[in-house]
């Protein structure tokens, strides 16, 4: 199961956010067995979209709890919240397209 996360980043903070994501958030996720499989920044430079992967939907609560208790997450402190104005999270399941 994949989870697509779309964040509206505060004005003028995208470069700082991308750096924080690449050096702190992504490694902290991957250290807990939550791979980040894709990232994008929209053309207006105010939205950051990323996808993280779980074995299945049942895996999400335990993995998220372990992540929030990890040293990697704790070391981020308030930095993520200082960058994010709005957050939207969608759970995605791979399916077959109808003919």
Regions found by a protein language model. Give the residues of each.
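Short, structured motif recognition centered on aromatic/hydrophobic residues
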Residues: 1-6, 17, 28-29, 48-52
């Amino acid at each position: 199961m994949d989870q697509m996360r779309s964040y509206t980043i505060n004005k003028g903070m995208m470069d700082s956010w991308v750096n924080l994501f690449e050096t702190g958030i992504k490694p902290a996720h991957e250290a807990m067995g939550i791979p980040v499989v894709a990232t994008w920044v929209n053309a207006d430079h105010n939205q950051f979209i990323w996808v993280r992967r779980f074995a299945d939907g049942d895996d999400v609560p335990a993995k998220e709890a372990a992540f929030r208790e990890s040293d990697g997450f704790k070391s981020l402190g308030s930095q993520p919240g200082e960058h994010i104005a709005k957050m939207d999270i969608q759970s995605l399941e791979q399916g077959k397209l109808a003919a």
